[in-house]
């Protein structure tokens, strides 16, 4: 068993102990049947499952924010200057060139501050609010660091990778919300994505600092973020993996299923016979394991899927 699988399993077991639950076994026949089945694109069938579900987990990835105009930094052309995002989002990259890493995240902050939640974000928030009045629970697990779900009104949310708008002191570890743009004067006008743009080479003393201690600040990127892999087992300590055990309906929205840890949740849920619906513009390596797959822009498919079902209580 890999370290990543072990960490996820450990968190799942921790949650189940706290809830007084036991992990149900995965039947081998169930595995085979799920793997061999083809996902359905019948929206009416999906909505019948949706109408009966009491605990709904919605997992979102870069695709849903891409429809708001946010670069995904994945796939062909997914570069900032000449760098891949994953090459910059590491402790090693930050230690070697903190100026370059801060330029990259300054660019991302500037882009996101000019964008807005789209129809998919709004539909998810409206669904959560509506179902909560019916005694049903919706939780959103997002890989995105743009806070669009929160801006759209979602309340019950786990930000697996943290936020571009929280900073952490390198010395005391405290975290603060920071929407200043630029986050420090030295980053004004920096971070251009053009491959020919020169590196700013900002002196260390001019990079973001914690006001009270004077120590350096870094973006508070959580859990499985490559920049802070040590937070995997302590940030949002139990919520996301637990949902793979107690949810009775899962939705996979605009995510490639390749990014850990979220990439493991959908298959884990599906192997326990829980209906999982994938909403994406493309199929993914695990699409065949899911009960449903809906192809198309999330801003179109999600509002339809999450709209009130005729059987819902209205009063």
From Swiss-Prot:
Residues 40-312 form the Deacetylase sirtuin-type domain. The active site is at residue 161. One of its GO terms (biological process) is protein demalonylation. It is an enzyme of class 2 (transferase). NAD-dependent lysine demalonylase, desuccinylase and deglutarylase that specifically removes malonyl, succinyl and glutaryl groups on target proteins. Activates CPS1 and contributes to the regulation of blood ammonia levels during prolonged fasting: acts by mediating desuccinylation and deglutarylation of CPS1, thereby increasing CPS1 activity in response to elevated NAD levels during fasting. Activates SOD1 by mediating its desuccinylation, leading to reduced reactive oxygen species. Activates SHMT2 by mediating its desuccinylation. HAMAP family: Sirtuin_ClassIII. In contrast to class I sirtuins, class III sirtuins have only weak deacetylase activity. Difference in substrate specificity is probably due to a larger hydrophobic pocket with 2 residues (Tyr-105 and Arg-108) that bind to malonylated and succinylated substrates and define the specificity. This is NAD-dependent protein deacylase sirtuin-5, mitochondrial. It comes from Monodelphis domestica. The lineage of its organism: Eukaryota, Metazoa, Chordata, Craniata, Vertebrata. The gene is SIRT5.
